[in-house]
UniProtKB/Swiss-Prot annotation:
Database matches in InterPro entries: Peptide/Ni-bd, SBP_5, SBP_5_dom
Protein name (database record): Glutathione-binding protein GsiB
Entry's Gene Ontology BP terms: dipeptide transport
Family label: Belongs to the bacterial solute-binding protein 5 family.
Keywords noted in UniProt: Periplasm, Signal, Transport
GO molecular function: peptide transmembrane transporter activity
Cellular location(s): Periplasm
Protein's job: Part of the ABC transporter complex GsiABCD involved in glutathione import. Binds glutathione.
Leader sequence residues: 1-26
Species of the source: Salmonella paratyphi A (strain ATCC 9150 / SARB42)
Subunit annotation: The complex is composed of two ATP-binding proteins (GsiA), two transmembrane proteins (GsiC and GsiD) and a solute-binding protein (GsiB).
SUPFAM superfamilies for this protein: Periplasmic binding protein-like II
Gene3D superfamilies according to UniProt: Dipeptide-binding Protein, Domain 1, Dipeptide-binding Protein, Domain 3, Periplasmic binding protein-like II
Length: 512
């Protein structure tokens, strides 16, 4: 609006022709090729990291995580915690506007957290916020959040990409359709969403951080085929691509116009086994399958060396992670265990995948071949985001068709609870959360709950170690690898990188 009026008055003054004489600055438009489709632009209703990463174009939280996964202030300026650990008082940044002109204030925070913590809204990320008892406005720049019980990782929850501040006016206007109409305080605002092709965002002129953003637009384009993603970089159709096909990393590194980056990750890849169903209810079967997979070979075949064999159920860079001796590759031991379990000739099963990109296909095919060597016939199905949401995340134990499920997890809060509880706590079977092994152990449940109630690091260490020791011994998973994150970008693109949880950081991105 302001820009239009300025041009109008300049024309009236007869200066438009002189302005036209100057060469126009080249638009700073960036295309980002990503490996899968988006599910929604409502961060509170997205289970996939990619949708939440793209939503960071429009949205910000009270807190965020830096590239080392440490908590930083964003829309909050600071906070205090009561002695009993139940009340968090947060001071807010002043002078921030939503993209629809509404003020960001304590009432906006309350509107968002009330929505997120209300089970009647059936938001997929409800479990992050279910411990909130109430949110109160103290004054326009102060909000008080009271918890139902102490939860020592709560600030990390507020730093999770899901905890975005959405304009209350937009929430009221669009209701359940807010996922198609994002309105936040972020550096970019929605221009176009072609649900089968791309999301394009444009610079928000009213952004509160002076001098930002530096780009005029970002187009997020899903490209599931690894080779096509790499080709788009080579031809200049894209300026950033992730993930890079591992087998093409060396080739891209030789391109003088591109920069290849291999960065640390908290992305763990694993196969869960539904322990409520035969034959996976038998611990010897689960052990056998762990012996059947040559993880070192998998690293080479599927990840071209850009991964390390898993040494636990929590990636090593997460606090309180425990490391163990990796499972050795021993197919003879695997066959022996199957025989002891009553399956001397093996069995048939299904292996589903939460991804359908080329790397996932390689993992599935490799695993299928490895299992065949010990007599297990696995029928593989690679799912897209919609299938995964319907068949895996949306069904309870009785309806679930999940047997073996290849997927990945990154603890996007940067702490141990989110690396363990959603995946192993008894109350977190689908459709509640992501315990696709349908694993249950009372001691593990007790340890995870107790760890959240204490601020004593030594006690936390003891509790998280005991829980991980039990899980590792009972083997509801086949832990596979921890990925290295390989991205590539045009050398004239700066300030755009991959976070350890596979999200994106692009606040300072610029095209030189």
């Amino acid at each position: 609006m302001t820009q239009f009026i300025t041009h109008k008055w300049l024309a009236a003054l007869g200066l438009a022709s002189s302005i036209a004489a100057f060469p126009a600055l080249a638009a700073k438009d960036v295309v980002v090729a990503v490996g899968s489709n988006f599910t929604t632009l409502d961060p509170y209703d997205a289970n996939d990291t990619l949708s939440q990463a793209v939503a960071k174009s429009f949205y910000q939280g009270l807190f965020g995580l830096d590239k080392d996964m440490k908590v930083k202030n964003v829309l909050a300026e600071g906070y205090t915690v009561s002695d009993d650990g139940l009340t968090y008082t947060i001071t807010l940044r002043q002078g921030v506007k939503f993209q629809d002109g509404a003020d960001f204030d304590a009432a906006a925070v309350k509107a968002n957290l009330d929505r997120a913590s209300n089970p009647d809204n059936h938001l997929k990320r409800y479990n992050l916020y279910k411990n909130i008892a109430k949110t109160e406005v103290v004054d326009p720049v102060t909000v008080k959040i009271t918890l139902k019980q102490p939860f020592s990782a709560f600030i990390n929850i507020l730093a999770h990409p899901a905890t975005a501040m959405i304009s209350p006016q937009a929430l009221e206007k669009y209701g359940k359709d807010i996922g198609f109409h994002p309105v936040g305080t972020g550096p970019y605002q929605l221009e176009t969403w072609n649900q089968t092709d791309f999301v394009k965002v444009k610079k928000f002129s009213g952004y509160w951080q002076q001098g930002l953003p530096k780009l005029d637009s970002i187009t997020w384009r899903p490209v599931t085929d690894n080779n096509t993603r790499a080709a788009m970089l080579q031809t200049g159709e894209a300026q950033f691509a992730f993930p890079i096909p591992y087998e093409q990393a060396a080739l891209l590194a030789k391109n003088k116009n591109l920069e290849l980056v291999a960065s640390p990750s908290i992305m763990q890849r694993y196969i869960s086994m539904n322990v409520t169903q035969k034959p996976f209810d038998n611990p010897k079967v689960r052990e056998a399958l762990n012996y059947a997979i040559n993880r070192q070979a998998l690293v080479k075949v599927a990840f071209a060396g850009y991964a390390t064999p898993a040494t636990g159920v929590v990636p090593p860079s997460i606090a309180y992670a425990q490391s163990y001796q990796p499972w050795p590759y021993d197919p003879a031991k695997a066959r022996e265990l199957l025989k002891e379990a009553g399956y001397p000739d093996g069995f048939s099963t299904t292996l589903w995948s939460s991804h359908n990109h080329s790397t996932a296909q390689k993992v599935l095919q490799f695993t299928q071949q490895q299992l065949a060597q010990i007599g297990i016939k696995a029928r593989i199905t690679a799912m897209d985001a919609g299938q995964r949401a319907a068949e895996v995340e949306g069904k309870g134990q009785k309806e679930s068709g999940v047997r073996m499920f290849y997927t990945g997890w990154s603890a996007s809060t940067g702490e141990a609870d989110w690396a363990l509880s959603p995946l192993f706590a008894s109350q977190n079977w689908p459709p509640t959360q992501f315990n696709t092994a349908l694993y249950s152990n009372k001691q593990v449940d007790s340890d995870l709950a107790a760890a959240l109630k204490t601020n004593d690091p030594q006690e936390k260490t003891r509790l998280y170690k005991e829980a991980q020791d039990i899980i590792w011994k009972e083997s509801p998973w086949i832990p596979l690898v921890v990925e290295k994150l390989v991205s590539a970008h045009s050398k004239n693109l700066t300030g755009f990188w991959i976070m350890p949880d596979t999200g994106f950081s692009f606040d300072d991105a610029d095209l030189k």
